[in-house]
Amino acid sequence: MSRFFLRNAFMFVVYAYLYIPIIILVTNSFNKDRYGLSWKGFSWNWYERLFNNDTLIQAAIHSVTIAFFAATLATIVGGLTAIALYRYRFRGKQAVSGMLFIVMMSPDIVMAVSLLALFMVVGISLGFWSLLLAHVTFCLPYVTVTIFSRLNGFDSRMLEAAKDLGASEVTILRKIILPLALPAVVSGWLLSFTISLDDVVVSSFVSGVSYEILPLRIFSLVKTGVTPEVNALATIMIVLSLALVVLSQLITRKNNH
């Protein structure tokens, strides 16, 4: 009984540590008190101010745009890479797998400096394209590993049987591999979208003054204190994240049935 109680108490403390700050943030986004020190009544005032703050709205649009295209490109390239690693034998296969894990384990600051040096050598100006390429780079390994792990759990004899029955590689890819990998594809896209939307370190190195994204804008604002508009914006982002998670679960459940 005591062990059961301690386990549940520990889990309660962990979840409280994770979610109480989020609850406070969401609550303060509706609080009339600017500093959130006490509850002074429900108000939509901070959301109205947020939507009148053109700088924050523009930064949010930039972030969502970068995250969408980065996640989509990373999912396409990462999916094809995962299929190649799972389906075919080729020289350098182990090296490709190793490089993916190296990118995943590299500190953000190392990734940021490396990409900045590359863009300077190649001549890519800092802005939209440098941000997009950087975000695709650090999202790609996560998508590849997610999809490959899903494919690696399937019996490859099913693919060989389809090939023996005369199915072409395109048919096998379209009729067997892609439907089986769909939950991992959706998960990989959502993971990439979240990682891209949340990145600060790499983005701070490769972004230009002409294309400011939301994490960098918020980072510059919180140096002087968290404003209620930031709380309101964070609440909207939380709702968006929850909606994406629910959508992912619905797609996965539909595919499994």
Swiss-Prot record:
SUPFAM superfamilies: MetI-like. This is Spermidine/putrescine transport system permease protein PotC. The chain crosses the membrane at residues 8-27, 66-85, 101-120, 129-148, 177-196, 232-251. The keyword Cytoplasm does not apply. It is a multi-pass membrane protein. Belongs to the binding-protein-dependent transport system permease family. CysTW subfamily. NCBIfam families: PRK09500.1. Residues 28-65, 121-128, 197-231 are periplasmic. Residues 1-7, 86-100, 149-176, 252-257 are cytoplasmic. One of its GO terms (cellular component) is plasma membrane. Keywords: Cell inner membrane, Cell membrane, Membrane, Transmembrane, Transmembrane helix, Transport. The keyword Membrane applies. Its main location: membrane. InterPro entries: Bact_Polyamine_Transport, MetI-like, MetI-like_sf. Residues 60-248 form the ABC transmembrane type-1 domain. It is found in: Cell inner membrane. Required for the activity of the bacterial periplasmic transport system of putrescine and spermidine. PANTHER family: PUTRESCINE TRANSPORT SYSTEM PERMEASE PROTEIN POTI, SPERMIDINE_PUTRESCINE TRANSPORT SYSTEM PERMEASE PROTEIN POTC. GO terms for biological process: transmembrane transport.
